[in-house]
Amino acid sequence: MIEADRLVSAGVISEEEVIDRAIRPKMLAEYVGQPVVREQMEIFIKAAMMRGDALDHLLIFGPPGLGKTTLANIVANEMGVNLRTTSGPVLEKAGDLAALLTNLEPHDVLFIDEIHRLSPVVEEVLYPAMEDYQLDIMIGEGPAARSIKLDLPPFTLIGATTRAGSLTSPLRDRFGIVQRLEFYRVEDLQHIVGRSAACLGLPLSDEGALEIARRARGTPRIANRLLRRVRDFAEVRAGGEMSGDVASRALDMLSVDSEGFDYMDRKLLLAIIDKFTGGPVGLDNLAAAIGEERETIEDVLEPYLIQQGFIQRTPRGRMATQHAYKHFGITREG
């Protein structure tokens, strides 16, 4: 799959998880960026602790790589409770969810990543658990089957999703707190990269951190990945020095340009500009032109390009914007 091969993919790569845990902020005081979310969560957490209550159920949504799992960990740490982690696709049966819920201590946090992928059967079990702290369990089979209710301790469910619109209304309505994570500003990413470098003991200059931040597509996960690749380049080609110039040379070598675009982003944009005179072009024609599946374009390639104003999605197809022409130094005809 193309996403796993891209340096600027916002998806998590398995070997990164151990390093990411080591550099992940643990408390709100260490959490950089998302000022509105940070301020609101600080108030909600303190209020819940003052009352001696569990925090209201929390839904976190936004593009991948922006720190939804990090925020869930911070909530548990701030509340001083345990965090149990799972994901929507893993919870195949109602019993899978019941096993997690019955092992929670009072005020514990249950974090469900990709919550939009819960099966309807599991979701039905979740409703009374969230609303009334009760678990309905079927005992036996056939005519002899009966339902019993188990009381659960007060707990906090944190759901994370990249597709909030895919959640059913009954599930979405049961979250008392809803937070959207936005793409990060360059200055916040610079701070994050600098902190990560310090945690890893890397001699990264302020200029080097800024260069990485500029090309990280507003995403901390990508910024930390680029930091590690710049480190590799610096160790082999620059005697370990991680200056702005070294970072720029490293990222140029890796074909990550000033906007954070890689070869696939450029291939897509240039296909629209060169092969279809800027568009509009239908998705199937565009997919054939660059040799990719339409799902790859829709889910992987174009979201960031649209968000940054390089592609416009119209009823007649995709169009390259003036911003895209300017990026490549191409004069738009007509």
From Swiss-Prot:
Q: Which organism is it from?
A: Erwinia tasmaniensis (strain DSM 17950 / CFBP 7177 / CIP 109463 / NCPPB 4357 / Et1/99)
Catalytic reaction equation(s): ATP + H2O = ADP + phosphate + H(+)
Q: Which InterPro entries match?
A: AAA+_ATPase, AAA_lid_4, DNA_helicase_Holl-junc_RuvB, P-loop_NTPase, RuvB-like_N, RuvB_C, WH-like_DNA-bd_sf, WH_DNA-bd_sf
Which intervals of the chain are annotated as region Large ATPase domain (RuvB-L)?
4-184
For this chain, the family text in UniProt reads: Belongs to the RuvB family.
The ranges of region (Small ATPAse domain (RuvB-S)) come to 185-255
Q: Name one Pfam family in it.
A: RuvB_N
Gene designation: ruvB
| Annotated binding of DNA, by residue | 294, 313, 318
What is the name of the protein in this document? Holliday junction branch migration complex subunit RuvB
Residues binding Mg(2+), per UniProt: 69
